[in-house]
Amino acid sequence: MKNFFLSLKTTVWTLFTLVCLFFVGSYMMPAHKEVFSAMNDQILFHWVDNTASGNLGQTWWFFAALAALVLLTINTLVCSLQAIKGRWSREDFLLRISPQVIHAGFLFILLGHLLGAGWGFKLSGMMPEGAFAPLPESMALRLQEIRVKTDERGYTLDWAAEASIYEDNALVKTGILGPNKPLFYKGVGIYLKSLDFERGPAALLVIAKDPGAVWAFVGGVLFILGSMTLLALKWNVRV
């Protein structure tokens, strides 16, 4: 069993299986929007519990991909532990540590997505100007004002919204939301997506908390650093 997880063939075939499953998913997701569209409106584990588990005919590839990722994670851990146990020398330290940094980055990225999938939250909806809405973790949001800047012909030049965050009924932060300009507080991000004036000024907001974002960022940095270092060392050896 240990040799199975140490084998490079296990890695290659697992990656090949993942590519095939993702190819199937690229067809299934647009073909069954009624099942997969909810993935954008809630965290992953909630979607799995509420939707995916009851539609296995359309989501089987997703669960198979999760199983393949678990196998790849175990394969990565076993290979890294085996490599660390070997003898180390100053001459080949960087050459041997670089792949382990890449592995660590990959595992941190997976950890980040796992945390975000299970312990975050994602809410979305239209919020009228002046409205007050409760949020998880004893927080609340108030949309104070919607601002639209137009030219002399009435065309929109810019738009924004002022929002306030409350915690335990106390005002803790106020900021301006705009396109690509979210408001953050304690890991909670508030995003302004669009405005609606048909039924009075209202804003389409997305409120999300991803506790794994930092871990995924660290993993991405480690993965890039390890890859660049390994590539540079291999290049020097060839030259």
Q: Can you say where each PLM-predicted feature lies in the sequence?
A:
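Solvent-exposed, non-transmembrane regions of integral membrane proteins
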Residues: 1-239
